[in-house]
Amino acid sequence: SSYDLLVIRSPWDYPRRVAEFEEWFDRVAAMTRVLNEPALVRWNLDKRYLAQLAERGIGVVPTTYVATTDDASAALAAHGDAWVVLKPSVSAGSHDTALVRADSPEAEELAQRVITRGATLMVQPEIPELSQGAERALYLIDGQLAHAIAKGALLERGGGFIGGVYQETPQVVTTTAEEVAFAEATVAAV
């Protein structure tokens, strides 16, 4: 309460301590002003927000959310032997995230691990452009583009990280009018 403002920057361990983070966040938000808005921070903790964005007309990677091992097996089978990205819906730093063949033992093992701990698993088809490092992040402040980065590829096909370690390689990029329009539409949908 002795602070005028709290800016949340990098709470990288929140996925391992969700309940503790939420309790702390509720206490702090009751005592001081928080950026971003507390409701937005809570909404953003779980990547199931992607389904809400899709319902609002925003293009997202097709995603199946599963909470049981039977549903995970069915979701993986629907992809045959294609490459898929698997990850918990509450995650950061690509923890328990992998790019694997849908019919591989690694896919079943990761699905089991995520679901057994009570988390929701996301199953997404590989988007080759993203696997090649073309994912972009556009940062808007008060609705205006501040800057953009190409995030770089992280996941090695077959599991693990490229080069064996989690290493982000962001590069500042110039955006297209189409990318800015998409970012603005996404913010408006939130």
Regions from the PLM with identified roles:
Residues 53-54, 79-97, 118-133:
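ATP-grasp fold ATP-binding core
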Residues 39-41, 67-71, 89-93, 103-106, ...:
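Short acidic/polar capping segments at secondary-structure boundaries
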Residues 1-67, 71-73:
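Conserved N-proximal alpha/beta basic substrate-recognition cap immediately N-terminal to
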Residues 52-60, 78, 103, 113-116:
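Basic phosphate/pyrophosphate-binding loop/patch that engages nucleotide-derived ligands
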Residues 101-190:
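Phosphate-binding site of ATP-dependent enzymes
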Residues 6, 34-35, 61, 85, ...:
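Structural detector of well-ordered beta-strand residues that form the stable sheet scaffold
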Residues 2, 73-79, 112:
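Short amphipathic alpha-helix with an adjacent loop that forms part of the alpha/beta core around
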